[in-house]
From Swiss-Prot:
GO terms for molecular function: squalene synthase [NAD(P)H] activity. This is Squalene synthase. The gene is ERG9. InterPro entries: Isoprenoid_synthase_dom_sf, Squ/phyt_synthse, Squal_synth-like, Squalene/phytoene_synthase_CS, Trans_IPPS_euk-type, Trans_IPPS_HH. Its cofactor is Mg(2+). GO terms for biological process: ergosterol biosynthetic process; farnesyl diphosphate metabolic process; isoprenoid biosynthetic process. Its EC number is 2.5.1.21. Pathway: Terpene metabolism; lanosterol biosynthesis; lanosterol from farnesyl diphosphate: step 1/3. It is an enzyme of class 2 (transferase). It comes from Mycosarcoma maydis.
Amino acid sequence: MGLLSYILLGFTHPSELRAMIGYKVWRDPLNDIKANPQASGWDRQRMRDCWGFLDLTSRSFAAVIKELKGELSRVICLFYLVLRALDTVEDDMTIPAQRKIPLLVNFYKYLEQPGWNFTESGPNEKDRQLLVEFDKVIAEYQLLDVGYKTVISDITAKMGAGMASYIELSAKGPLKVAMWKHFDLYCHFVAGLVGEGLSRLFSESKLERPWLGHQLELSNHMGLFLQKTNIIRDYAEDCEEGRYFWPQQCWGDDFAKFESQPDVAKGIIEIKPGHFRPADNELGQRSMYVLSSMLLDAMSHATHALDYLALLKEQSVFNFCAIPQVMAIATLELMFNNPDVFKKNVKIRKGVAVGLILRAVNPRDVAYTFLHYSRKMHARLSPADPNFTRWSVELARIEQWCETYYPSFIAAASEGKPTDIRANALRSWSESRRTQALILKQAKLNGSDASTLDAKSVLEAAQNSALDPRDLMTEDERAAQDKRDRDQMVKFFLIILVGMVTFMGIVALITWEIVWWWTMDTPDPLSVYVKHAYYLVKTQGWSTVKEVLRTTRLSFEHVWKHGLTSPPKLEL
């Protein structure tokens, strides 16, 4: 982004510009691979080359992988490079099927062959160099512990076999998927297995609980949520290259009735360069129905992803898993009822992505990010959509999940906004528990019976003896005190600002007079104006001046008493 783009972003989306500045200036990475070269392998040129391959293949994934704790960052880096090399072989259309299938099936065996590489990739393959220098990845792989090697080899074998089966099917014609269950199986091979492998590596590293590696179903949902989002987003590119991943059961059902996946885009028309909308006829409705069905299928994995994230305990692992998930839910919301999906690649803005990264730090914030985007989709959901009921149920599941694990009334109570009767009940209960704890503490100090102590006297005694009065305040009292402190601080800085401006004005005026008197022979215009104003006031009276001064004084008094905050609006 150029300077002009940032300036425009500041006017159109100031919160995103603020997030980008905050990320660049104030956010520090959780871990740095250069700070622990033995664990990350940065002390070896060969491993530094592998980190370079990771940067070339995916900068977004590279950033979160590098922040993983200890040796796990190196392990995940090699795991990603192995699977990326496998995926490069699968996607290379210049390799004939009879050569590609044995390569995919036996790829896991090559990890045990030092010096093996592959130089037959097409010249236009983005990650061709990774396969050319794959011997470096193999050498680093051999340095891993046996547990890590077992997981990586096992996942590579399963994924290679799954990819080979689809290559064999597509050898007779363009690759396409018939039914929803086949679509799930394909996504499992290319992404669900990645989630399974990551969970097993997390457990193997001892950073996460041992049983996390056995959560295969939740791990699969994590991978499918990301993969299905990417498949929907890449519709136009895949159709152009002859890859059809959307299941025929979706675009060829009794309502859609399309003959092929590329035909789905026929219901979308261009209104101006780069902007599209569905046609005002049945064809346009059927196209948007297919998009709605695909998005709904992807959304079915959302709450399962939240279940998985709630199991994680290591912060760097949580960030690694959560950031792609919040990106996915934001992308799904952007594609919801968006006909541009059929004609071009739809991506969230960079500022939005940075804001999501800053918020994806704990399960509650991630859950409420999901809730935020689900509500945005629900606001645009049309009853005319044949999937309206199913969409309502799926979005309500996210609402229910958040309310079950992170109830809104607890958030309301902590923020001092009693919008829910449960918040008042929670506040009263918390205050009674605090008072009871103080009574028990005072009784223990005095050696007296707690039942004989008066709550009011105990609170007064505690307030008098407390080192910090805030420790004995309720949430509401602490919030009110914070507001008073902020107002006092604003008043203080206002006085300082006025004083500085006044002083600088006086210095500027004196300098002006001296320079004019020293360099000019005529009277300075400022003195002439002041004299003119003085005689004007003298002749016309002081009533106007007094009224202006009175209004100014009342304004300053209002700011001094009430601060700079405006009174709340009356809501009916």
